């Protein structure tokens, strides 16, 4: 009775909470071996709480990331949606990439990573550029709820997904990614089906924004015609405001 309300904390959880540290109470490798979804969950907690994952836990995540293939995609998708709803989704995706889990279920996104140099000319790393775009978008729509902007966030994450398939180097000109928005838009249905995301109007919305995302850039050109502006307004329809973010 004299110990009623006394917290029993054999693993030092209170201290970890105070210090903003995530760790597994038992052996990390065994923990993630028992249920590999905990790898994605750890990235999600780090993303939502702004906590750091301790090194032994990260090592366990790396060692067992290959076991992601035993999971149903529905379970992974549920965690992905929570990462996408966070204030800084890039944290979760960086962790999943660094531990090798992202490669297991989202290879199209990982394909954006890397910098190639030809004749001294290099292109930017489109993976980390994409994560920055997502974070910037989330910040710019902070007055709107995460549920309201969820599919806009997915569109930002997938906006350059077609670049690896359209990358070209032209001597004397440099790197180009012509048509990457169309290639990316065509990839959306297959990715949504595999990732167990809804293949309804929400997918159509993402596909539309990916397809049109490069068009507003052309409007910066002083020579752009009024008809080009009208075409964009017509093609974008109700999504014009989201497209311009």
Each model region followed by its residue ranges:
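Active-site-proximal binding-pocket segments
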Residues: 220-222
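Glycine- and charge-enriched loop/helix tracts that form the active or gating conduit
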Residues: 1-157, 161-203, 207, 211, ...
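Alpha-helical scaffolding flanking metal-ion-dependent phosphate/phosphodiester catalytic sites
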Residues: 154-165, 224-245
